[in-house]
Amino acid sequence: MTLTAESGPLAGSRTDVAGELRHVDKWYGNRHVLQDVSLQIPSGQIVALIGRSGSGKSTVLRVLAGLSHDHTGRRLVAGAPALAFQEPRLFPWRDVRTNVGYGLTRTRLPRAQVRRRAERALADVGLADHARAWPLTLSGGQAQRVSLARALVAEPRLLLLDEPFGALDALTRLSMHTLLLDLWRRHGFGVLLVTHDVDEAVALADRVLVLEDGRVVHELAIDPPRRTPGEPGAHTERYRAELLDRLGVRQ
């Protein structure tokens, strides 16, 4: 596993960390969008990042993904992170298997091997029989499954999810939660889930971070983590109330 860092050496780096930011600051013009942000995503953990619109959640994800370089502080990732967004961003003129294979662009693998790995990734998300389908024929849930397959085809240690289920209906969302947890259990990657949905954060995460005006202002460990989406947990309302209070939402 390759550890990569920016903005100076990372003393004490450990291979059980999938992704980490240390004292990161970022500006957009005169706006200080990230202020001394430090966070860690251990391998095999799901960390949710919640906050109001404009709090800097997607910027944190972009810095971790290596898509933003004009920041101060330190970034540590295990290998190349994978991303999935709210919009699947599939190429409509390429079939599903080819879209998934684009997740291996950096590897320069032979074409036949790319096809095999893409087909295996599609089987992983329950779409083995859709390899030759066209993106425009897919439902919203199927398209998001293809997006996950593309993210995971390169076998990343860190998966970054930016509101991936926000555009789906309630039942499809629960199905995607179950799929994500199944993939997480089987592959053991670390996850940073950016979401505006407090219930989703409590349902999926080991830890929830609250971002406010570019700062991490609260961290909540979900103990024990609830791993059965759609089923109520005795602790759910308590955690939900605490997070809503930190977000300034009156119940």
UniProtKB/Swiss-Prot annotation:
It comes from the Bacteria. The keyword ATP-binding applies. Signal peptide: none annotated. Residues 19-238 form the ABC transporter domain. Keywords: ATP-binding, Cell membrane, Membrane, Nucleotide-binding, Translocase, Transport. It holds the Pfam family ABC_tran. Its EC number is 7.6.2.14. This is Aliphatic sulfonates import ATP-binding protein SsuB. It comes from Mycolicibacterium paratuberculosis (strain ATCC BAA-968 / K-10) (Mycobacterium paratuberculosis). The gene is ssuB.
